[in-house]
Amino acid sequence: VTAFASTTDNSSTVHYGIINSPEWSQMTRIERVAACQLPAEELHNLVTDELVQVVLDYPFFVDARAFNTNREGFLRVLAESTALQELLNREDNVDSLISRYATTDVETVAATLSEDNDFSELWKLEILLAQPEFSNLMDEQQVVKVFEIAEEKHEAKCSNPELYQGVTGVFYQSVNEHSGASTYAYNSYVQTP
């Protein structure tokens, strides 16, 4: 079984339409991962901003949070997602990720979260931007911009602790995992009055 793109009434493309099919519930995890691999030609034809959306929508991206570190989780998703592999090959990948991160509104995301509130696109973007595969491509201005945006998002998430508990410091945690940096700290505990 292969993944397929379908068009909805509002003309937005759903790249992982297979997850809504009757076959999905009958598949093993290996078959599901295989079904979520989009054809190379389709990936090549996407502009980078669209490709970022496809990466964020990857049904198994959530698995990144099931590992001891965000780095280990990222590497698993990278190994399994041809869309993420394609994103790494784009010259404008960092610009697209930074732009998406900057324009993702914490309040809007919080308002649309379901019970799976930890699984918003914010933490996905934060994990991606903190990985050396992307951060090593950044110039000094981009690094400064990412940290400025991260600080802004962190403060906004901290103002909604009931929604973002456990994921307020994903960016800083991810940076610290592979850099050994201690300049930026994150709270790994909840403070109560």
Which functions belong to the PLM regions below?
Residues A3-A5:
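Boundary at the C-terminal end of the N-terminal hydrophobic targeting segment
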Residues N20-E23, M27-P193:
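Non-catalytic all-alpha helical scaffold/repeat segments
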